[in-house]
UniProtKB/Swiss-Prot annotation:
Domain Helicase ATP-binding, residue spans: 127-298
Name of the protein described by the UniProt record: Probable ATP-dependent RNA helicase DDX6
Class of enzymatic activity (EC top level): hydrolase
InterPro entries to which the protein is assigned, alphabetical: DEAD/DEAH_box_helicase_dom, Helicase_ATP-bd, Helicase_C-like, P-loop_NTPase, RNA-helicase_DEAD-box_CS, RNA_helicase_DEAD_Q_motif
Sites bearing Phosphothreonine, chain numbering: T36
Motif (DEAD box): 246-249
Length: 483
C-alpha cells in the first residue's frame, strides 16, 4: 500500500456507515494561532525554502491604496468565520485586541487574514512581554495559539532594511518546521520584503547554502541542521536578536540538549530567548537558569489536558484491537482521525489492515524518506484522506483542525507522550475524542498516567454523544441566523 498521492488521488469515503461524506475534509478558520492554517503548496513542499513576501515597493503600493481615515479592514480577504463553540482554554481572555499592541498595519492585515480575530490567553500574556525584549518561559497547552504568541512579536521586531538573520525558531521535527514556516509566511505576506527560510535535516545542504547566500530575515529550523550551517559559516547569526524554542521540553531532552547549548553559544549575548512548552522537566529548568535573564514566567496550565478533549478507554486483547478499531470507524462520525502506534513496523502493518477493511488511510513515520513524509503530511492536511496512522513523530505541535478523533492503538508508556498525542484533537478550544485501546499489560500504566496528569479516562460507553466531538452538533448560529 502506498500512502503518497500522485495524480488524481481517489479517496475512499467512509460511506453511510458512520455518516461521513466522500471528498476532501474541510475545517473552519480559527482565531488566534489555532485557526486552520494555510496549506503548503506543492512547490513549497521542499523542506528548505526561502520565501520573499513581495518587495518594499509592492508594500508601499498596497499601503498607498489605503488612505488615512479609510476602514482598511474592508480591504481584507477574510476566511469564513469559525462558528464552532470553543472551550475556556482559548476564550478565557482579558478582552484585548490585536490592535492594542501597536503592531504594524501590514502585520495586522496578515493576522486578520489568517482568521485570527482576537488574541488567545497565551498570546495576551506573551505578545506585549516579547515586544519589550524580555526573555519568556511560557507553559501553555498544545493547540492554544502558541505559534501566534511568538511569531507576531518576532515579525513586528524585524528591520527589513537590514539583510541579515534577525530571528530563529527552533523546533524538534521537520513537519513542525514546515508548518511554522507556512504560518510565518502567511502572517507576514503584507510586510514587503520579509524573507522566511525553513531548513531541516533530510534535505540538500547545497540548497540551504545557496538560499543563505541571499537575504534571510527569519530562519525556522531543526537543531542539527541549523548548527551544521552555523559551523560551516553559512548561517551568520551574529545579528540574531530573538531565538524561540518551540516544544522546549523535547528540544532540551537528551537527543538535542547539547546541540541547543552549542547553538546558544554562537548567538550575541544580548539575544532574547522565548521558551514554549506544555511540560517543564528538570532539563528546561536547568537551561533556563543557565541562559535566560530574569525571564517572565507564564503558566496557563491549571490542568494539563485540553478541556475540549473527552477521553475514553476500551479493554481489549492484542488480537481484538483491529476488530475494535473497525467498530469505532463504523460507529463514530469521524472528520479526520490520527491513530498512534508505538513502532514504525506496527504503523505500516496497521495501515495495511485498515486499507484492507475498506477505509481510506495514510501512514507516516520517521524511517520514511523526507519527500514522502512531506507528501503525506501535505495531503492529509489538505483533507485528501480521513485516517492517518503514525508514530510519535506526529505528536509535536502539528495543527490539523479537521482532526476530531485520536486513537491510541498502542497505549504510550509516558504521561508526556500521552499528553501530546491526545492534543492532536481538540485544537484551539474545539472539541474532540481520545480513545485508548488498553490491554492487560497497559492497565497499571493507564492508572499512572491518569494520576500524573490529574485527568480522568473513562470506560467507553456503547454510544458516544456526537456533541462531544462533531462540529455540527456544537456550533454557534451565524450572525444573520441569530434571533
Amino acid at each position: 500500500m502506498s500512502t503518497a498521492r500522485t495524480e488524481n488521488p481517489v479517496i475512499m469515503g467512509l460511506s453511510s456507515q458512520n455518516g461521513q461524506l466522500r471528498g476532501p475534509v474541510k475545517a473552519s478558520a480559527g482565531p488566534g494561532g489555532g485557526g486552520t492554517q494555510p496549506q503548503p503548496q506543492l512547490n513549497q513542499l521542499k523542506n528548505t525554502s526561502t520565501i520573499n513576501n513581495g518587495t518594499p515597493q509592492q508594500a508601499q503600493s498596497m499601503a498607498a491604496t489605503i488612505k488615512p481615515g479609510d476602514d482598511w479592514k474592508k480591504t481584507l480577504k477574510l476566511p469564513p468565520k469559525d462558528l464552532r463553540i470553543k472551550t475556556s482554554d482559548v476564550t478565557s481572555t482579558k478582552g484585548n485586541e490585536f490592535e492594542d499592541y501597536c503592531l504594524k498595519r501590514e502585520l495586522l492585515m496578515g493576522i486578520f487574514e489568517m482568521g485570527w480575530e482576537k488574541p488567545s490567553p497565551i498570546q495576551e500574556e506573551s505578545i506585549p512581554i516579547a515586544l519589550s525584549g524580555r526573555d519568556i518561559l511560557a507553559r501553555a497547552k498544545n493547540g492554544t495559539g502558541k505559534s501566534g504568541a511568538y511569531l507576531i512579536p518576532l515579525l513586528e521586531r524585524l528591520d527589513l532594511k537590514k539583510d541579515n538573520i534577525q530571528a530563529m525558531v527552533i523546533v524538534p521535527t521537520r513537519e513542525l518546521a514546515l508548518q511554522v514556516s507556512q504560518i510565518c509566511i502567511q502572517v507576514s505576506k503584507h510586510m514587503g520584503g520579509a524573507k522566511v527560510m525553513a531548513t531541516t535535516g533530510g534535505t540538500n545542504l547545497r540548497d540551504d547554502i545557496m538560499r543563505l547566500d541571499d537575504t534571510v530575515h527569519v530562519v525556522i529550523a531543526t537543531p542539527g541542521r541549523i548548527l551544521d550551517l552555523i559551523k560551516k559559516g553559512v548561517a551568520k547569526v551574529d545579528h540574531v536578536q530573538m531565538i524561540v524554542l518551540d516544544e522546549a521540553d523535547k528540544l532540551l531532552s537528551q537527543d538535542f540538549v547539547q546541540i541547543m547549548e552549542d547553538i546558544i553559544l554562537t548567538l550575541p549575548k544580548n539575544r532574547q530567548i522565548l521558551l514554549y512548552s506544555a511540560t517543564f522537566p528538570l532539563s528546561v529548568q536547568k537551561f533556563m537558569n543557565s541562559h535566560l535573564q530574569k525571564p517572565y514566567e507564564i503558566n496557563l496550565m491549571e490542568e494539563l489536558t485540553l478541556k475540549g478533549v473527552t477521553q475514553y478507554y476500551a479493554y481489549v486483547t492484542e488480537r481484538q484491537k483491529v476488530h475494535c478499531l473497525n467498530t469505532l470507524f463504523s460507529r463514530l462520525q469521524i472528520n479526520q482521525s490520527i491513530i498512534f502506534c508505538n513502532s514504525s513496523q506496527r504503523v505500516e502493518l496497521l495501515a495495511k489492515k485498515i486499507s484492507q477493511l475498506g477505509y481510506s488511510c495514510f501512514y507516516i513515520h520517521a524511517k520514511m524518506r523526507q519527500e514522502h513524509r512531506n507528501r503525506v503530511f501535505h495531503d492529509f492536511r489538505n483533507g485528501l484522506c480521513r485516517n492517518l496512522v503514525c508514530t510519535d513523530l506526529f505528536t509535536r505541535g502539528i495543527d490539523i483542525q479537521a482532526v476530531n478523533v485520536v486513537i491510541n492503538f498502542d497505549f504510550p508508556k509516558l504521561a508526556e507522550t500521552y499528553l501530546h498525542r491526545i492534543g492532536r484533537s481538540g485544537r484551539f478550544g474545539h472539541l474532540g475524542l481520545a480513545i485508548n485501546l488498553i490491554t492487560y499489560d497497559d492497565r497499571f500504566n493507564l492508572k499512572s498516567i491518569e494520576e500524573q496528569l490529574g485527568t480522568e479516562i473513562k470506560p467507553i460507553p456503547s454510544n458516544i454523544d456526537k456533541s462531544l466531538y462533531v462540529a455540527e452538533y456544537h456550533s454557534e448560529p451565524a450572525e444573520d441566523e441569530k434571533p
